[in-house]
Amino acid sequence: MDAAAKSLGATELRSSWRKGKKLAVLYRGEWIHFGALGYEDYTTHHDDDRRASYRRRHKAILLRDGRPAYKVKTTPAFWAWHLLW
């Protein structure tokens, strides 16, 4: 997963120290925490139907400027989409 994060532009990937989050990436000098603790993700359950459902739901999350959140590297949604799902 570390190699995947670096290929997406992250400098570092660590376990999150923020309550309720799984991971954190260092991207452009800012830490971005993502992934809810206590919930499974595709890396743990490998269920293609659940992955498709997650992606369908999260495609609908838009930023104020109308861009999908999962396409913007400064959002937790981007990192969860690419590293966990």
What is the meaning of each model-derived region?
Residues 1-85:
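Arg/Lys-rich, low-complexity, intrinsically disordered basic segments
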